[in-house]
Design a protein with these regions (language model features):
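A glycine-/small-polar-enriched, mobile loop at the entrance of the PLP active site in fold-type I
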Residues: 37-40, 55-73
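Substrate/cofactor-recognition hotspot
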Residues: 8
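Conserved N-terminal alpha-helix of the aminotransferase class I/II PLP-enzyme fold
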Residues: 64-97
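PLP-dependent class I/II
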Residues: 2-4, 12-14, 19-22, 26-33, ...
């Protein structure tokens, strides 16, 4: 009998973390590597937020808090939801975790039973299916194709719902594609959900503030107030506030769900880092002017990435509405051989050879459930982007 849990056979390590670690190892070994795999901003955490953390430390605000977060941050989150999303929550309806990933995991662990299904549009963030499996559920994948700009249609959602469906995971703007649903597109989905009152909505809004070209962000419970009682609206400070390592995610939802999630968290990590919570209060309540300034940089990089990738033989790339990713297709590269004689049979081989032959690290599309593609994070310097796309262009140009 194996010492390790049989549950581990159902899941795999995070491919995005694996790519980032591989790139870091090659750099440490002296290799010339440009990493386009990491899903985090290259900006520093704003100074006022760091000062708030320092102030908390100097004043001894470093003790335990309630298992799912301190009241001061819960109140700040309530203010954020009201200000940005027209959603009214009480502090008892707020859960704070060690990153958005823990919030999603807690919700699934608190609600899933054997046989329960969770609808996940593809391409998806790599952790969604594995978290469902760990919670004992069944991921049901619904392809949001490139022909529909990587967005799920109302008809697809309708056709995927069964009497076993418990959750629909919604992510806009999306990781890995950056696709954002307009109000009209989201309204069509909410109309379907209103016809199926047994289906709950898990809305991952982590990239809410990272949008471009006057795109108007919206979230399901905002669009359809009648969904409020069966929606968990998830967010965090990692992306918009350049606080990935501070590990603060949060959610608003029905009190009975939040209470169940608190029970899970009280028996796992207990409270998120207290100092990080005080920093998050300042992030949400403090000046927000740096966000549009950062977005100007992200938009410039997005436009650069889309142009240079579309100028590359065998690659085509859509222009996303948000986040800091592009998800180009490599359909025109499949079946060709590299200068090293390796046949590009799929996007995993493409990404592997790209790293080995050019030193550019990207994440292969199969990790996100839709191929043949790869994900590029353009949250890095213009210099690195230009050099990386130069190498990608050369690599693809030499395919035969």
């Amino acid at each position: 009998m194996s010492f390790l849990s049989s549950n581990l056979s159902r899941v795999k390590p995070s491919p995005t973390i694996a790519v980032t670690q591989k790139a870091a190892e090659l750099k440490q070994a002296g290799k010339d590597v440009i990493g386009l795999g990491a899903g985090e901003p290259d900006f520093d955490t704003p100074e006022n937020i760091k000062l708030a953390a320092n102030d908390a430390i100097s004043k001894g605000k470093t003790k335990y808090t309630a298992p799912d977060g301190m009241i001061e941050l819960k109140e700040a989150i309530c203010r954020k939801f009201k200000r940005d999303n027209s959603l009214l929550y009480a502090p008892t309806q707020i859960s704070i975790g060690t990153g958005g990933k823990q919030i999603l995991y807690n919700a699934l662990m608190a609600t899933m039973n054997d046989g329960d299904e969770v609808i996940i549009p593809t391409p998806y963030w790599v952790s969604y299916p594995d978290m469902v499996l760990l919670a004992g559920g069944t991921p049901v994948l619904a392809e949001a194709s490139i022909e529909n700009n990587f967005k799920l249609t109302a008809k697809q959602l309708e056709n995927t719902i069964t009497d076993k469906t418990k959750w629909f995971i919604f992510n806009s703007p999306s990781n890995p594609t950056g696709a954002g649903y307009s109000k009209a597109e989201l309204t069509e989905l909410t109309e379907v959900l209103m016809r199926h009152p047994h289906v709950w909505v898990m809305s991952d809004d982590m990239y809410e503030h990272l949008t471009y070209d006057n795109f108007k962000f919206c979230t399901p419970a905002e669009i359809e107030p009648k969904l409020y009682e069966r929606t968990l609206t998830v967010n965090g400070v990692s992306k918009a506030y350049a606080m990935t390592g501070w590990r603060i995610g949060y959610a608003g939802g029905p009190e009975h769900l939040i209470s169940a999630m608190r029970k899970i968290q009280s028996q796992s990590t207990s409270n998120p880092c207290t100092v990080s919570q005080w920093a998050a209060v300042e992030a949400l309540d403090g000046p927000q002017t740096f966000i549009p300034e950062n977005n100007k940089t992200f938009k410039r990089r997005r436009d650069l990435a889309v142009k240079l990738l579309n100028d590359t033989p065998g690659i085509s790339c859509l222009t996303p509405e948000g986040a800091f990713y592009v998800y180009p297709s490599i359909l025109g590269c499949i079946g060709k051989s590299t200068s090293a004689g390796v046949v590009i049979e799929n996007d995993e081989i493409f990404a592997t050879q790209l790293l080995e032959e050019t030193g550019v690290a990207v994440v292969f599309g199969a990790a996100f459930g839709l191929s043949p593609n790869f994900r590029v994070s353009y949250a890095t310097s213009d210099e690195d982007l230009n050099e990386a796309f130069k190498r990608i262009h050369k690599f693809c140009s030499e395919l035969t």
